[in-house]
Structure formats: structure tokens, C-alpha cells
Amino acid sequence: DPNSPQYLGDLFSWSAIGARTTESQTHREMASGLSMPVGFKNGTDGSLGTAINAMRAAAMPHRFVGINQAGQVCLLQTQGNPDGHVILRGGKAPNYGPEDVAQCEKEMLKAGLRPALMIDCSHGNSNKDYSRQPGVAESAIAQIKDGNRSIIGLMLESHINEGNQSSEQPRSEMKYGVSVTDACINWEVTETLLREMHQDLQGVLSARLSQEV
């Protein structure tokens, strides 16, 4: 809902615009007024242009009708959001590897943007097989350990229990803690993966930050 983010904004610290919505001018304007980083997913075909153009648009000031912090309809004037980034979610093929990341960095620099990207471990990067998410995450962590400075985060699809289920079945037959949208890894796998990433990156991120200061 592009009308309510200013009213709900204090509840969130990060936002993402999906692959099919990144082209929307309404959502680009909305992103320009959010007081948080916003990620734009690459196109469903894997193209980067839409996400990069969305970042550039969201960094500019805009005016549009919305709802303010008091819940009142008003004309909002934004200053632009400098904290946009690309989310690599795959497309016709995965795009989380070192060559794909380097290509994204190159295109962002060409557009006058600071390379900043997030790796979506699900969707096209896992070929829609939720059990492959840890492998994608491990690749991204390896790139960071090898010196990559543009990868700023990872996206996982996680739930209490693994897999997914239809929301159209009788409620009495639905399983507790199982996604009704995309298939997810379970909490045990998620916790193990998070602990492993923390261990692998100890000292790495702090060193990267000290180099950027």
C-alpha cells in the first residue's frame, strides 16, 4: 500500500520493493520519502536496469498525496532517499555469483550510484527450491570474505517449519508455522545458518567498515 508508509514508518527499519513493482512510479515516489534504506529487486527476467532506474528516481525529491504520521491525508514533499540498493533475486538464471555481482557493480557505477546490493537467497537464485538457500548464502559470505565491499546483506525466506501450503484448504487441515506463500527453510536451519555466518564474518565486516571511514 503506497499510501500508508509515512503513518507506519516508525515500525520498520528496512523496506523492499518487489520485482514486479520496481517499475511503478508510485512506489518510487513512496520510497523517496521513507526514513529507512529501501531495496529494489531486479526484473523477473534478471535485468538490472529497472532496479537501477528506481534507485535513481527514489533518490530525488518528489511530491505526492499520502497519509502523514497523524493518519491524515496530505500532500507529502520528500527530500529523496539516498539509501537505495539493488536486490539480486535471480531471473532466467541465478545472479548471485561473483561475475553477476561484479556486473551489477559496474552498471551501478555507470549510472552514478555507489554500489550497494543485497543477495536474495530465494526466488530465482534458488531456482525456487527453498532447500538451496543456504548454498546461496554461503556463496555470498565467501565473496565478502574474499574482499567484496558492495554486498550489504542477505535475504532469506524463513518460517517456523519448512515448505509451504495452500491457504485455500480448510483451516483445520492447515499445518502450524508453515508458509502460505513462498516455500521457506525452517527455524532450525535458519538459526544454524545465522550462527555460521556470524562466525565466518567475525572481524571481516568491522575491518571493511574501518576501511570505508
From Swiss-Prot:
Enzyme Commission number: 2.5.1.54
Catalytic activity: D-erythrose 4-phosphate + phosphoenolpyruvate + H2O = 7-phospho-2-dehydro-3-deoxy-D-arabino-heptonate + phosphate
Gene Ontology terms describing biological process: amino acid biosynthetic process; aromatic amino acid family biosynthetic process; chorismate biosynthetic process
Record-stated family: Belongs to the class-I DAHP synthase family.
GO cellular component, one term: cytoplasm
InterPro entries assigned to the protein according to its UniProt record, in alphabetical order: Aldolase_TIM (IPR013785), DAHP1/KDSA (IPR006218), DAHP_synth_1 (IPR006219)
The keyword Transferase appears for this protein: yes
Uppermost EC category: transferase
Protein name: Phospho-2-dehydro-3-deoxyheptonate aldolase, Tyr-sensitive
Source species: Enterobacter agglomerans
Record's function text: Stereospecific condensation of phosphoenolpyruvate (PEP) and D-erythrose-4-phosphate (E4P) giving rise to 3-deoxy-D-arabino-heptulosonate-7-phosphate (DAHP).
Top-level taxonomic group: Bacteria
Pathway(s) the chain acts in: Metabolic intermediate biosynthesis; chorismate biosynthesis; chorismate from D-erythrose 4-phosphate and phosphoenolpyruvate: step 1/7
GO molecular function: 3-deoxy-7-phosphoheptulonate synthase activity
Additional facts recorded: There are 3 DAHP synthases, AroF is feedback-inhibited by Tyr. The other 2 DAHP synthases are Phe- and Trp-sensitive, respectively.
The keyword Amino-acid biosynthesis is annotated on this UniProt entry: yes
Keywords (A to Z) from UniProt: Amino-acid biosynthesis, Aromatic amino acid biosynthesis, Transferase
